[in-house]
């Protein structure tokens, strides 16, 4: 079906005092179309709510029982959905959809905000191919209320950059959520250790004091280039591919993670700092204007520091899983769109692989296939010289001969 509606900010500003119908009449007149082809805003809204889609072109897949889901276009070079997005849309129609809840109410990162530090891009931007909403998930903002437990249908709870301390009753609710097997993604920030450590200490994890630095000539000293570990490559074949390609995860301002395994969880580092040139800065407060120097006397030590952890434990016939990140900016709106010359970053892969692991491979759909086997060569070494003679000698002479023949015939005309 076709419809018209003022939706984009450009159109809304340009035609602020003009009705939707008048704008549509201008456009159809320019394009030599008939306005009767298009449903009015009132007619389309009576059939379907396209406001969350921004009234863009969208496909809807519908089953006979009324189940439906959207299949969108994306603002990238490929535009159309590919196998992963189509498969995710189809799976949504036939299985229980995992619900992701982003905790709010304590200054956390906002999944509905397009600001640089917030999470709209990876959570619910319909035009971003790797957003959770385009890969099979339902995503909501969730605020804990007095007297109510965390809903049973929340599969993954995201707690990112808490600025105000969680109350005892809120921590108890999270404890009960974890006790029943709920999964978590927790992201901290330098300066928030005191607020967030009471949350992660129950899992044997601690956000260490200070801020990690990796001084370089071109970038801020607190820009950490996280490297995938051997444990990460065992968790995900896609991580293994990224490691071979020397891809990194950029963290602009990260805190090191310390952990023990005495809380019942198996803990595996997913990302660590480089083994040289990186340390936990404790003294310097203004990293941009003050010199950043390693001071062993102050307890600063150069080495490898974990900056992302994967925690797991068996619960009945399934595995409970938790991801802890030492930086909340690495999956923010600005960092996902950031390009830095000389750094091959793949931060969106951290999102897709983390949530794939948290759902035990259900979503996002993994369309990776084994590399084709190419292990046999039928050509013998003794025959190589004739191949060389053919391609280096005979074939070039034939091409030259053909060129001379064509030139001679044309010259004769």
Predicted regions and their residues:
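Hydrophobic targeting/anchoring helices
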Residues: 1-127, 131, 364-367, 376-393, ...
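Conserved beta-strand termini and adjacent loop/short-helix elements that scaffold enzyme active sites
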Residues: 1-4, 103, 142-144, 210, ...
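Generic alpha-helix detector with strongest preference for long hydrophobic helices that associate
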Residues: 42, 71, 113, 147, ...
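A mature extracytoplasmic/lumenal domain signature
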Residues: 63-65, 73-77, 104-106, 163, ...
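Acidic, S/T/G-rich, low-cysteine, solvent-exposed domains in lumenal/extracellular/periplasmic regions
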Residues: 120-363
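A glycine-rich phosphate-binding loop feature that marks nucleotide/adenosyl-phosphate handling sites
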Residues: 216, 370-373
């Amino acid at each position: 079906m076709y419809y018209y509606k003022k939706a984009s900010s450009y159109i809304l500003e340009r035609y602020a005092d003009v009705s939707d119908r008048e704008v549509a009449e201008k456009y159809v007149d320019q394009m030599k179309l008939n306005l009767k082809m298009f449903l009015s805003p009132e007619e389309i809204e009576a059939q379907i709510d396209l406001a969350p889609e921004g009234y863009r072109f969208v496909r809807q897949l519908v089953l006979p029982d009324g189940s439906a889901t959207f299949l969108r276009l994306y603002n990238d070079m490929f535009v159309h959905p590919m196998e992963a997005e189509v498969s995710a849309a189809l799976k949504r129609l036939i299985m229980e959809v995992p619900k992701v809840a982003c905790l709010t109410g304590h200054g956390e990162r906002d999944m509905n905000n397009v600001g640089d530090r917030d999470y709209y891009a990876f959570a619910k931007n319909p035009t971003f191919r790797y957003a959770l909403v385009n890969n099979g998930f339902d995503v909501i903002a969730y605020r804990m209320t007095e007297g109510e437990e965390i809903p049973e249908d929340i599969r993954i709870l995201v707690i990112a950059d808490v600025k105000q301390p969680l109350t005892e009753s809120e921590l108890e609710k999270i404890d009960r959520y974890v006790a029943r097997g709920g999964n978590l993604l927790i992201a901290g920030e330098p300066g928030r250790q005191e607020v967030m450590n009471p949350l992660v200490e129950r899992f044997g994890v601690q956000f260490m004091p200070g801020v990690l630095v990796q001084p370089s000539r071109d970038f801020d000293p607190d820009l950490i280039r996280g490297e995938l570990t051997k444990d990460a490559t065992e968790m995900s074949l896609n991580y293994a591919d990224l490691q071979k390609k020397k891809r990194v995860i950029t963290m602009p301002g990260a805190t090191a993670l310390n952990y023990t395994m005495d809380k019942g969880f198996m803990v595996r580092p997913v990302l660590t700092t480089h083994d040289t040139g990186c340390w936990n800065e404790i003294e310097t407060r203004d990293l941009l204007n003050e010199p950043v120097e390693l001071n062993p006397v102050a307890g600063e030590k150069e080495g490898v520091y974990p900056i992302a952890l994967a925690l797991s434990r068996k619960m009945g016939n399934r595995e409970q899983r938790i991801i802890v990140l030492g930086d909340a900016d690495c999956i923010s709106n600005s960092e996902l769109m950031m390009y830095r010359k000389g750094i091959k970053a793949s931060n969106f892969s951290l999102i897709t692989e983390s949530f794939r692991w948290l759902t035990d491979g259900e979503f996002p759909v993994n369309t990776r296939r084994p590399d084709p086997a190419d292990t046999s060569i039928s050509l013998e070494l003794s025959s190589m010289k004739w191949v060389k003679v053919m391609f280096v000698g005979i074939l070039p002479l034939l091409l030259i001969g053909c060129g001379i023949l064509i030139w001679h015939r044309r010259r004769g005309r």
